[in-house]
């Protein structure tokens, strides 16, 4: 028996899928493989990014994918067909597609070789090995000179707050805007007000895929702040730097989610948007860990 987990999306999504694979293989006491198929449409936009971390990610070969390769080549058709099929879990037990964002314990009950397709965006899938996940996600390469300076600044700041803003694809892609939406200036104003409560002398470290926008938007912030300009090519360093802060404001982004989650401190404060998508069809009650504050 082995499991294969489909990889898709950006770094935050990839981390969820790897953590899910890592956890389910541990629970089922079996091996796992990651399907990072280059024909996957997601990778025309996003790159495979887990190789920046010192983790062993067993990638599926063509031989491993022999019985599933047709799923990838006809992914959209098969995905639609599977969703419409009655008794699909009985007729096709080797294929498991995530139906909602809500934790589904059925995933842990598979008994044969299974191909898993989903985002798995809830800590509940890997909370049992949370400490292991955090300890394993260390960077392969030393920080760049720029990021090292930022880390030193964070470490010298008793009350460092990471603030994440995701804009580029959510604002400029009409499909993403309609489905996902993005956090408003009012959200950030309310989140800042809440996160500094009982916190003397906060210093904000602002991370974003739109550096120019955050520089302009937060110029009147009444607290010391630093806008980080690593860019997409160093987003894994941003993730590490975010985790070094003691409090966090995240956007409706899996990347921001991981930046806050990787902070192992039990007393950390995390402020997150209560609405993750524009559509109300997606149940996200399990997306945010217990204790995170919704605004």
Predicted regions and their residues:
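Extreme N-terminal starter segment of soluble prokaryotic enzymes
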Residues: 1-4
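A short, glycine/small-residue-rich beta-strand->loop->alpha-helix junction that serves as a flexible
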Residues: 7-16
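Donor-binding and catalytic core of enzymes assembling or modifying cell-surface/extracellular glycoconjugates
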Residues: 11, 193-272, 277-280
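Histidine-anchored nucleotide/phosphate-binding helix
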Residues: 15-25, 188-192, 196
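Short, well-ordered beta-to-alpha junction loops that form the rim of enzyme active sites
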Residues: 36-38, 165-166, 207-210
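Secretory-pathway luminal glycosyltransferase catalytic domains
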Residues: 45-194, 198-199
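Leloir-type glycosyltransferase catalytic cores
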Residues: 278-295
């Amino acid at each position: 028996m082995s499991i294969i987990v489909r990889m898709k999306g950006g770094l935050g999504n990839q981390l969820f899928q790897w953590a899910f694979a890592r956890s389910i293989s541990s629970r089922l006491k079996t091996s796992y493989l990651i399907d990072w198929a280059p024909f996957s449409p997601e990778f025309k936009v996003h790159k495979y990014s887990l190789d920046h971390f010192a983790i062993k990610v067993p990638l599926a070969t063509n031989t491993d994918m022999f019985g599933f390769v047709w799923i990838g080549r006809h992914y959209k058709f098969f995905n639609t067909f599977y969703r419409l099929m009655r008794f699909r879990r009985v007729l096709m037990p080797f294929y498991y597609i995530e139906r909602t964002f809500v934790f589904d314990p059925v995933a842990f009950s598979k008994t044969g070789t299974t191909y898993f397709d989903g985002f798995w965006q809830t800590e509940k899938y890997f909370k049992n090995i949370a400490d292991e996940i955090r300890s394993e996600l260390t960077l392969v390469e030393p920080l760049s000179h720029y990021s090292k300076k930022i880390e030193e600044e964070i470490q010298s700041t008793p009350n460092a707050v990471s603030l994440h803003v995701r804009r580029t694809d959510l604002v400029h892609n009409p499909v993403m805007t309609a489905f996902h939406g993005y956090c408003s200036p009012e959200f950030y104003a309310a989140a800042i007000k809440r996160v500094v409560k009982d916190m003397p002398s906060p210093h904000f470290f602002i991370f974003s895929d739109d550096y120019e926008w955050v520089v302009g938007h937060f110029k009147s912030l009444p607290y010391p702040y630093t806008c980080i300009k690593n860019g997409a090519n160093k987003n894994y360093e941003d993730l590490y730097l975010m985790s070094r802060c003691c409090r966090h404001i995240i956007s409706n982004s899996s990347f921001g989610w991981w930046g806050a989650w990787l902070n192992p401190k039990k007393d950390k404060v995390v402020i997150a948007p209560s609405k993750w998508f524009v559509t109300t069809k997606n149940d996200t009650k399990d997306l945010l860990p217990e204790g995170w504050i919704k605004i």
